[in-house]
Amino acid sequence: MDVYRAIADPTRRAILDELADRSGQSLFELCARLTMKHGINSSRQAITQHLDVLEAAGLIRTRREGRSKLHWFEGGPLKAIAERWPISTDERTFER
């Protein structure tokens, strides 16, 4: 999966925000935090599909612990994008 397509969806960006803030969450924890902090009331099945897309893009990694599957943020692909197109804070960059 393409990283750009993975981050194009606002729900997936919210999932990444939550995992960047607190990695190692289960699906249940993620769904609760998405509802409370972002007002996202998607089903567990829908969030699972979003997590699958993010994992395929290399933006998250998972590990099973007992019956739970835990999710971690993996920033490597985003770091590669930032390194490819660095953002300058120099005001002259924006002048024409």
Tell me what each language-model feature is.
Residues 55-66, 72:
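Beta-hairpin "wing" of winged helix-turn-helix
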Residues 10, 22-26:
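Short capping segments at the starts of secondary-structure elements
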Residues 1-18:
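Short alpha-helical segments that sit at the start of domains
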Residues 35-47:
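Short, positively charged loop/turn segments that connect secondary-structure elements
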Residues 51-52:
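Short, hydrophobic-biased segments on the C-terminal half of alpha helices
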